[in-house]
Amino acid sequence: MITLLEARNIGKRFGGLQALSDVSLTIRKGEVYGLIGPNGAGKTTFFNVLTGAYTPDDGEFVFNGAVLPSGKPHLVVAQGVARTFQNIRLFRELTALENVMAGHHIRTSAGVWGILTQNRHTVEEERLTTERAYELLKYVGIERFATATAKNLSYGDQRRLEIARALATEPQLLALDEPAAGMNATETVQLKNLIEQIRGDGITVLLIEHDVKLVMGLCDRVAVLDFGRKIAEDVPAEVQKNEAVIGAYLGGGHKHAH
């Protein structure tokens, strides 16, 4: 399979804390790739470095054969990497439709002048953006809430809305940070089906998730972080038998990196 993303020797320090140390992994086009580990293992830090929220102290990410810009989230999104967050970050006062439209605007060409003057091209782009946003709400199963304010949606539907907004940026890689957190069993099954649908439509998925059952039943390959280092990378069945992984989950004391 073709490599989509390669993490090369990623390191990140916060003062005297080594949050990530020499993390290398390869994600192939079309797979669902899981990133797991105990609390504080460095999973979200890895996401933050990948998506430009943090600048790595060591190493680089290569995406589609080109080095990703570091410390510049908008440029990372423009390259085709989108993410959701462990703590939901929606525009709470906007409608569900408006939230998704906001995600799609990175792919439109209207400048400030076009928006102010509402020229014909801008009006047409806005119509297409609205249409696409509604399609994505339908895709994730919440189109009936298109005009509802985001803050009034249920927790599970807010998660789906955040995924729809990320998909609106037209990513090649969708990075999901604990999307099943706070979901009940029914919502988790629906999420699994949605991720499989996203993968089936050609989008590669990188998944951080504490629900190990979900990860093992969904991911093609899994990497495990412990204290900022990669201790395993394999198919789920092999990772589950890995003694270092078992020891990491039973060892406890993981509090220093996220």
Residue ranges and their predicted role:
Residues 1-258:
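Glycine-rich phosphate-binding loops of nucleotide-dependent enzymes
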